[in-house]
Regions:
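Secondary-structure end/capping motifs
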Residues: 219-300
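Extracytoplasmic/secreted envelope proteins and their assembly/folding machinery
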Residues: 37, 68, 83-86, 137, ...
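Pocket-lining segment of extracytoplasmic ligand-binding domains
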Residues: 84-85, 163-256
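Bacterial N-terminal signal peptides that target proteins for export
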Residues: 1-8, 21
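Short, glycine-/small- and polar/acidic-enriched structural segments
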Residues: 22-171, 175-181, 194-198, 204-205
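Conserved C-terminal helix/tail region of periplasmic/extracytoplasmic solute-binding proteins
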Residues: 292-329
Length: 329
């Protein structure tokens, strides 16, 4: 009888613990209002975090460096950011780990003034990027290298969010800037040409949208991490394949009311998101190579396992989650 009572008590305690975890508010950061932020938005708006028993709040933290700092400081539990600052921080011993990725390509296009018609015209010009140390800088450095343009011959300016850069470009304050849908469509309607798409670079693989968390949080809260990745994977797939669900999400989060712009943005990103949401190792190697070039005095550990841990994704794949989500089971 005593054993039965103990068993019942254990069940109650376990249920209470699960409920506490379900009710704990998890803060999830995203990096801006570009269309490539959609997987985090979809997980929230489609009720998938709730479906998997998570109470989440999304917070916007622009730039990978700030997003990384928020994770390190415990201000957020998960971050949807690009991998550059994460790799640099982890290499220096930060308690962080990348657990998933929904976008493994640069989503940007280089939009320019009308007098710039070829890459060589960028020499001596001002190019706006969101900030140094992230995907914008990496993609521009790669593009200049591919075009045989010396890095020092082009001025890169940290110019803030896309809306700021768009205004600066349209008013002549910048000669060029990197934009993603929906701003690329708006620029085209203003007659500003696109010089190049970063997805067309020879070295286009890049950890653009990764999910990171503290390694210690992952070890202590594996069940939460698993349920988070279940929601994130399902959100990514639903967004990619269900336009009727996806368009209202863009309408809400991008503050964009032009139906044509919203649809253009959806068509662009639905085709390049990654499902299953795994990290491209080629992209990681490229990011590490660029970090090493930018900081030659830093000894960089090139073992991808130091930065990426997809064991929970492996478990979900063995359990058939991705097949069930995509209807292939």
């Amino acid at each position: 009888m005593l054993k039965a009572h103990r068993f019942i008590i254990l069940l109650i305690v376990s249920a209470m613990s699960a409920n506490i975890y379900a009710q704990e508010r998890l803060l999830v950061s995203y990096a801006g209002f570009g269309g490539f932020q959609a997987p985090a938005w979809a997980a929230k708006d489609l009720g998938l975090f709730t479906k998997y028993g998570l109470n989440t709040e999304l917070v916007m933290i622009p730039g990978s460096a700030r997003g990384t700092q928020a994770l390190l400081g415990g201000s957020t539990h998960f971050g949807q950011i690009d991998g550059t600052a994460l790799i640099a921080a982890i290499n220096q011993g930060a308690d962080l780990v990348i657990i998933s990725a929904s976008l493994n390509k640069f989503p940007f296009s280089l939009v320019v003034q009308k007098n710039i018609t070829k890459p060589a015209d960028l020499i001596g010009k001002k190019v706006g990027i969101v900030a140094f140390g992230g995907a914008h800088e990496v993609s521009m450095v790669l593009a200049l290298k591919e075009w045989n343009i010396p890095r020092q011959s082009v001025t890169l300016l940290a110019s803030g969010p896309a809306a700021n850069r768009f205004v600066a470009l349209s008013s002549g304050g910048l000669d060029a800037t990197l934009l993603a849908p929906p701003e690329t469509g708006e620029a085209s309607r203003l007659g500003l040409p696109t010089l190049a798409h970063m997805t067309d670079l020879k070295a286009a693989a890049f950890p653009m949208n990764v999910i990171a968390t503290r390694r210690s949080f992952r070890e202590k809260n594996r069940d939460i991490v698993k349920r988070f990745l279940q929601a994130y994977a399902e959100a990514t797939y639903q967004f990619m394949t269900n336009k009727n669900k996806a368009l209202p999400i863009y309408n809400q989060w991008m503050k964009q009311k032009n139906p044509a712009v919203i649809e253009e943005t959806y068509e662009y990103f639905a085709a390049i998101f990654s499902f299953p949401p795994r990290v491209s190792h080629d992209g990681m190697r490229l990011a590490m190579e660029m970090i090493a070039q930018r900081s030659p005095g830093v000894r960089l550990d090139t073992n991808i396992d130091k930065y990426v841990d997809e064991r929970v994704l492996d478990e979900l794949e063995r359990e058939g989650l991705f097949k069930r989500i995509s209807g292939r089971s």
